[in-house]
């Protein structure tokens, strides 16, 4: 039991240390969201960074770099940063109810952003273009979320 507590304390301390010794890294993404051929305005989009810990989602949750909503044309443009020791693994999380009927919670589409679109520095150097995304279809790996 003592070893477990010491291990947890060391892990928490090391994740806090990332903010002290990690370097600021940036990513940016844009795109257009559609639902059955119409702009999907108001859809929440988050620019996230994947933290691959030994206990995913427990002690080291994914970092939110930026968030926003699609405009009246269904377009979004996000740019954000986070501190990490190693290179970041950015992705987009799109939370929507397109063709969802009365099913509770929202559908979540995850779009991985190539690491080549991430950089160290004071702002994003390149913007990943997710293109036009039709949300009416079903996507492999799609999940649901009631808390976003």
Swiss-Prot record:
Annotated Pfam families: TTR-52
InterPro entries named in the record: Transthyretin-like, Transthyretin-like_sf
Annotated localization: Secreted
Annotated glycan sites: 77
Signal peptide start-end: 1-17
GO cellular component terms given for this protein: cell surface; extracellular region
Keyword Aminoacyl-tRNA synthetase set for record: no
Domain of life: Eukaryota
The keyword Secreted is assigned to this record: yes
Keywords in alphabetical order: Glycoprotein, Secreted, Signal
Family to which the UniProt record says this protein belongs: Belongs to the nematode transthyretin-like family.
Protein name (Swiss-Prot/TrEMBL): Transthyretin-like protein 3
Lineage, uppermost ranks: Eukaryota, Metazoa, Ecdysozoa, Nematoda, Chromadorea
Encoding gene per record: ttr-3
């Amino acid at each position: 039991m003592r070893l477990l507590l010491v291990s947890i304390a060391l892990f928490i301390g090391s994740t806090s240390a990332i903010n002290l010794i990690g370097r600021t890294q940036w990513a940016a993404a844009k795109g257009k969201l559609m639902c059955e051929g119409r702009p999907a305005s108001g859809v929440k989009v988050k620019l996230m960074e994947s933290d691959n810990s030994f206990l995913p989602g427990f002690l080291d949750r994914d970092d939110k770099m930026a968030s926003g909503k699609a405009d009246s044309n269904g377009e979004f443009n996000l740019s954000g940063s986070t501190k990490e020791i190693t290179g970041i693994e950015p992705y987009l999380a799109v939370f929507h109810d397109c063709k969802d009927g009365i099913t509770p919670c929202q559908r979540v589409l995850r779009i991985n952003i190539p690491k080549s679109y991430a950089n160290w520095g004071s702002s994003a150097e390149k913007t990943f273009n997710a293109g036009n995304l039709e949300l009416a279809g079903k996507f492999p790996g799609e999940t649901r979320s009631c808390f976003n």
